[in-house]
A protein has these predicted regions:
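Short, hinge-like loop/turn segments at secondary-structure boundaries
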Residues: 7-9, 155-158, 214-217
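Acidic, Ser/Thr-rich peripheral helices and adjacent loops at domain boundaries
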Residues: 152-173
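Short, glycine/charged-rich beta-strand-loop motifs at protein surfaces that mediate ligand recognition
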Residues: 169-179, 210-211
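C-terminal helical/tail subdomains of lipid-metabolizing enzymes
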Residues: 183-242
């Protein structure tokens, strides 16, 4: 969901509303999880915040002219679906589905299909972007160079317990490390050929997926800004923008 702010040209918006609301149990909390089935609250986080409390600029998003896609995992097939977002407010359920983490989120229904987090089936959609015709790719990673995911000894048992009706989903979610590591290998290969520019942190980030410490968010944000100030000339060279 953060990515839409690039196209709406609203820098610091994601940082601002996360710092403002991360301590609010209506935003994300175990209270929300127990009462609604979603750790990240559907109504407050995905509707009230962007529509009323920190308004997302849909007009600027549309005027950007840049195609924007989200990746979701079809829970019936275990396959990724790539959904083009033309109107953020009208397609909020697709955005929500793309980040619906297993166990702490309900399955999201969108246009007759049932979805969960797209990162389970295609964490790094390199092949999809190449198939769209892009010959130069920029990938933003959250892990340092050399990182590889390790298999989890317990994840398959847990997924089988909670998603026993969806064996294809259980299989792809349990083997996420395999798909992720293959994508990283492809990224590194494309870097060597000059077809891909990877932006990655210099070290492991001390922040969790459901992080609620505003100081950690601020520190990582500032670190990212400083890194890109140092890297911008290299990125422009890669793009041929001299």
């Amino acid at each position: 969901l953060f990515g839409v702010n690039y196209l709406s040209n609203q820098p610091q918006r994601a940082l601002r509303y996360n710092k403002r609301f991360m301590g609010d149990r209506r935003y994300m909390s175990f209270w929300s999880w127990l009462t609604t089935g979603n750790f990240v609250n559907k109504e407050f986080s995905y509707y009230k915040v962007p529509m009323e409390l920190d308004v997302f600029d849909q007009e600027a998003f549309a005027d950007s002219g840049v195609p924007f896609y989200v990746v979701t995992t079809d829970i019936e097939t275990g396959k990724p679906d790539y959904i083009k977002i033309d109107h953020v407010f009208e397609q909020m359920e697709a955005l929500r589905a793309s980040s619906a983490l297993p166990l702490v989120s309900e399955i999201v229904e969108y246009k007759g299909k049932r979805y969960m987090d797209g990162g389970l089936s295609d964490s790094l959609p390199i092949d999809f972007m190449e198939n769209l015709g892009f010959d130069k790719l920029i990938v933003v990673l959250t892990r340092p160079k050399g990182y590889r995911k390790e298999p989890s000894k317990t994840s398959k048992r847990i997924y089988k317990l909670f998603y026993c009706k969806y064996p294809e989903f259980v299989d792809v979610a349990s083997n996420r490390h395999i798909h992720y590591n293959k994508s990283i290998e492809k990224i590194e290969a494309l870097e060597k050929t000059g077809n891909l520019y990877a932006i990655r942190p210099a070290h492991a980030l001390e922040v969790g997926r459901l992080e609620k410490d505003p100081e950690k968010f601020e520190a990582i944000y500032q670190e990212g800004l400083e890194q890109m100030r140092n890297e911008m000339s290299h990125l422009k060279t890669f793009l041929g923008d001299n």
